[in-house]
Amino acid sequence: MKFIHLAMTLAYSLPHIVDAFSTLSHQRIRTSNVGVSSIFTNSQRITTFSATPTTRRTTSLFSTTENKKSSELVSNQDLGLGTSGFSTSRIRNFSIIAHIDHGKSTLADRLLESTQTVAARDMAAQLLDNMDLERERGITIKLQAARVLYKSEVDGEMYILNLIDTPGHVDFSYEVSRSLAACEGALLVVDASQGVEAQTLANVYLALENNLEIIPVLNKIDLPAADPDRVAEEIEETIGIDCSDAVRASAKSGIGINDILESIVKNVPPPQPDTGGPFRALIFDSLFDPYRGVIVFFRVVDGAVKKGQKVRFLASKAEHDVTEVGIMQPNQVQVDCLRAGEVGYLCGSIKDVLDARVGDTITLSSEYKAAAAKLDPKSEEDPITPLPGYSESIPMVYCGIFPVDADQYENLRDALGKLRLNDAAISYEPETSGAMGFGFRCGFLGLLHMDVIRERLEREFDLDLIVTAPSVVYRVEKGEGDSKTVEIVDAPSKMPEILREMKVMEPYVRMEILTPSEYNGQIIELGQERRGILKDINYLTPTRSTIVYEVPLAEVITDFFDQLKSRTQGYASMEYQLIEYREGDLVRLDVKINYEDAPPLATIVHVDAAQTVGRRLVASLKELIPRQMFKVPIQACIGVKVIASASISPMRKDVLAKCYGGDLSRKKKLLQKQAKGKKRMKAMGKVNVPQEAFMAVIKLNKSAGD
């Protein structure tokens, strides 16, 4: 019996013993790999560990059964990326430019998926769009970058492809231009069913300004309405790019993805080799991490940077010690060094995103000081030449943001401060309104930027907000010659009431509208209503045309785009860019409610439209402001002159209801008592203006012809 019991015990324990030996052998294998670092092929997932937990890294390229050509391990030396003999000949830096809904983010997903940069289980729609807001709206707000390894099917060589995904909206055109400056090529993605759109043209012009090699990609060829031949001809006629070798693809279905990758390898030129000069890198984005500080994304142009060095940002003149450098796959992966031609990130315990502005140049502090020592102390020449194209982000649209609950003012201030950490283009300063209390006057790059920030404040920080009508930045010039002064006006309430001997300058934009030719008449009519100056009409094809206008920006930021879509049944698209400031015959239209000024409702309008806008604004406010127990007069004024007025009739209590008859003097006494009470209430009462009333100004701040 003892023997049988011992045999049963061994039989039960044997699987556990085998598992223990198996685990031990795996641990020995893992231990033998400590300190080994590799660059991995498309078909492998390998995790490497350094000797200390503090420097542990994970570098992964995920395996699938689809691609078995690249099963061998590729080392740094195989790619020419060793510490010596570094080569840039197999690096390709490219971007994707497209109009909204033409499939840019979907194509980026397919490129990451087909190269096994991201495993199928980790894939998600719009993978590079991290914010929920981006996925809901189908737009890219915050650009992303990803490093992809691809083994060419033509020459069998392994290539590093750095994809820099860019926002596509006109509000972020400067960020797009800096991202394109970090590339040598761009995929021009055009919907094969819709053809060339306005934002397509705008982004192509930016790419051409940066001398990028443009690869046309006709996307969505699997749609029933797709006509790639027509669209290819349209691209050639509109942009002048040869489309004979255009890649025909469908990002959704995965058609033509390998052709796109091969075209990138073949047509996009590699980065320029290292010239041996001082380290210089171009910043194309930054974000704030609560644990590591500001993370700076950049493209190395000359030299190299590694952990432990001190870097200097030329525009902000800030200096920081580098605590980490790495690449994006698309998750951040630490590396030892980044050299010329590579795209990566660095951390340096940077606390303010303004220290690392988009478009700024990074250099090594030691090299900067060495170069400065060789210059004449009186010389104004830069010791190290900054990379061209840098400019500071200038807000184009301003609005007031107030909390509905006055107790949330501190929360609003903290929320704006946190958003500012990730977005240096936001500007804000405290503002006080008698009607709405304490809030902030905020500046944005455009209407989309403003709308995105408002929605993030409400969604991420749980704030109830009142947002006033947006306004542009005006310039008021006083005097002439040496005594001339210029006052910047970013709010209607700051505009001087009396504009005698003053010039009011307003910003103008050059607007390019792409539309089916049958809607040309409606668009020209809309342009005339908005004080536009028609500059050009160009017929791309017999059925499509471009219309160029110069329009005051104030006429664009209201509902111009909505009107354009409405009058063209949604087929037209537009893009615009600021050109200059011009003198305008403008006046400040004030609103008084119950004889008290309401500064948030003030607006700046053209003098010819003031009468009409005033009447419509007063009528709209009359409908939106709730009735009170007393009569509420509403007035639209230019200076002291009332140009339109209306009154909200009071709610009336029937004080005679209890008098079934009797003495007339009793009724008069009750009516007189009621009148005295209403008079006192009118003198002391406050009128609460709802959010809808402020939004009404947005719709009414346009010319009288509309």
Swiss-Prot record:
It comes from Thalassiosira pseudonana. CDD domains: EF4_II, EF4_III, LepA, lepA_C. The keyword Membrane applies. It is an enzyme of class 3 (hydrolase). This is Translation factor GUF1 homolog, mitochondrial. Promotes mitochondrial protein synthesis. May act as a fidelity factor of the translation reaction, by catalyzing a one-codon backward translocation of tRNAs on improperly translocated ribosomes. Binds to mitochondrial ribosomes in a GTP-dependent manner. This protein may be expected to contain an N-terminal transit peptide but none has been predicted. Residues 89-272 form the tr-type G domain. NCBIfam families: lepA, small_GTP. GO terms for cellular component: mitochondrial inner membrane; mitochondrial matrix. It is found in: Mitochondrion inner membrane. PANTHER family: TRANSLATION FACTOR GUF1 HOMOLOG, CHLOROPLASTIC, TRANSLATION FACTOR GUF1-RELATED. It catalyses: GTP + H2O = GDP + phosphate + H(+). SMART domains: EFG_C (SM00838).
